[in-house]
């Protein structure tokens, strides 16, 4: 079983049919964690004993009355900014290394209600922004496809753990691309749902008006299954959207014939330079969508530079507002990269913020108008394959616009999925974006693409090793 990598959908069917137990599945994942973690650094806290106990309880409940959801008995983990009752929540920072919340975040509560089994807390960039740092209490996560390379972030540990098969799915957060960038670089699926669809209550904030929480898993279908458990209004999150929870799984296998896809070609051809592997991935995706009956054409939006200038002013100003009090008294306890980011926010003025908010409204209006003529936007998930950890400075988000930022500015639902393998066999990805609250269509298009490729059949070499005994 050591080289068996079930998706959530596959494992859910096997658990429901009692062909495998949650306990066996959880043991498999925990044994991989034990084997890989000294090198991968995907986890900050592993809850082995409580996970096995929860898996046993799941098996008893499923034997008695069947699974209460497809997530029942499925091993997952949480980015270490999701508050967990009685379990430290560190934000990968010295400042919170001993912080133990007294209640669970809403996402944790909803996953528990669905029956998911938590294996622990995963590595992140400090406070979901600091970047990969070596001056923190825990080392940064590494990319399981090549341990000398960067997994991106800030949901780095969750992405690395999913790709390595340590968990079947996990929770991330996304303020400027922190779910989608690591999904692209680690070769998995990551969903930033519509702003307000998934509660952020109990998630340590970075930028209130741009923060999203969402699922990361091996496939678009798995993200849909997780979203089904997560979505819904929450009075504890002031930005929570009071909209009906749809069935995100029921139509995922339906045809995409007639779906109108707009390729934002300037995002990856003129606004920035992407690598040949990234370019090939998006061109191959276009051909697949056409073959499946979609109607594809190019569209134009404001440049990536405009989206990023607006987004970073808002993000950094709001991040400083979150950290101001602590920064003034304990600035030396932040890692260098996070300290520098907060300092930038400190020097932005109220006028800067107001101008960015005004421009944000204009940009949102422009995107809404563009999407009256198309159903889905197609762009790249990241501009390049994963860099070496020693060259991670080249990944500095201030050097080159992020392809992910436009959809944090607008809050539109966006899915990153693997679109192939580029330089030295490292994953590349595409992004698909839908109109607000059209996640069923978005996930259906992503699933249709994945069914036409063999990318989901590959796993990193670390995950093929035989020393993770099941």
Located regions from the model:
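N-terminal, positively charged, Ser/Thr/Ala/Gly-biased leader segments
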Residues: 9-10, 17-99
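Conserved hydrophobic/aromatic pocket- or pore-lining residues that grip, position, or stack substrates
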Residues: 29, 51, 73, 79, ...
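Flexible, acidic loop-helix segments that line cofactor/substrate-binding pockets
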Residues: 41, 237-245, 259-260, 265-267, ...
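Short glycine/serine-rich loop/turn segments
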Residues: 71-213, 264-266, 316, 320, ...
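Short helix-loop capping/hinge segments that flank enzyme active sites or metal/cofactor-binding pockets
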Residues: 71-91, 250-265, 314-368, 416-427
């Amino acid at each position: 079983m050591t080289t068996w990598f079930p998706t959530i959908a596959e494992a859910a069917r096997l658990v429901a049919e009692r062909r495998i137990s949650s306990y066996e599945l959880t043991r498999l994942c925990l044994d991989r964690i034990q084997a890989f973690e000294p090198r991968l650094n995907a986890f900050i806290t592993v809850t082995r004993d409580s996970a096995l106990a929860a898996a046993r309880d799941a098996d008893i409940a499923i034997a008695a009355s069947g699974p209460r959801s497809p997530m029942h008995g499925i091993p997952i983990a949480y980015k270490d900014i999701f508050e967990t009752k009685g379990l430290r929540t560190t934000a990968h920072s010295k400042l919170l290394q001993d912080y133990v919340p007294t209640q669970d975040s809403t996402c944790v509560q909803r996953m528990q209600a669905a029956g998911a089994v938590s294996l622990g807390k995963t590595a992140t960039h400090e406070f979901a922004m600091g970047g990969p740092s070596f001056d923190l209490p825990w080392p940064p996560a590494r990319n399981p496809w090549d341990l000398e390379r960067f997994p991106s972030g800030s949901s780095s540990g969750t992405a690395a753990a999913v790709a390595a098969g340590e968990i079947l799915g996990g929770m991330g957060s996304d303020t400027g691309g922190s779910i989608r960038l690591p999904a692209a670089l680690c070769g998995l699926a990551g969903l930033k749902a519509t702003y307000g669809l998934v509660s952020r209550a109990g998630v340590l904030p970075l930028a209130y008006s741009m923060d999203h929480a969402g699922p990361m898993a091996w496939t678009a279908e798995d993200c849909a299954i997780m979203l089904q458990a997560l979505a819904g209004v929450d009075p504890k999150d002031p930005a929570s959207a009071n909209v009906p929870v749809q069935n995100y799984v029921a139509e995922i296998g339906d045809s995409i014939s007639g779906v109108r896809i707009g390729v934002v070609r300037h995002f990856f051809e003129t606004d920035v330079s992407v690598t040949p592997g990234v370019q090939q991935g998006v061109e191959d995706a276009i051909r697949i969508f056409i073959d499946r009956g979609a109607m594809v054409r190019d569209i134009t939006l404001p440049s990536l530079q405009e989206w990023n200038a607006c987004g970073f002013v808002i993000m950094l100003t709001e991040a400083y507002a979150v950290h101001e009090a602590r920064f003034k008294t304990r600035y030396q306890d932040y890692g260098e990269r996070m300290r520098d980011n907060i300092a930038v926010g400190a020097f932005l003025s109220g006028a800067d913020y107001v101008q960015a908010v005004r421009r944000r409204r204009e940009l949102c209006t422009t995107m809404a108008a563009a999407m009256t003529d198309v159903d889905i936007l197609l762009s790249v998930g990241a501009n390049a394959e994963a860099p070496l950890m020693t060259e991670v400075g080249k990944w500095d988000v201030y050097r080159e616009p992020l392809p992910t930022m436009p959809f944090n500015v607008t809050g539109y639902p966006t899915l990153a999925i693997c679109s192939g393998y580029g330089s030295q066999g490292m994953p590349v990805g595409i992004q698909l974006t839908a109109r607000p609250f059209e996640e069923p269509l978005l996930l259906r298009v992503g699933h249709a693409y994945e069914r036409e490729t063999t990318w989901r059949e590959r796993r990193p070499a670390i995950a093929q090793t035989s020393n993770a005994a099941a």
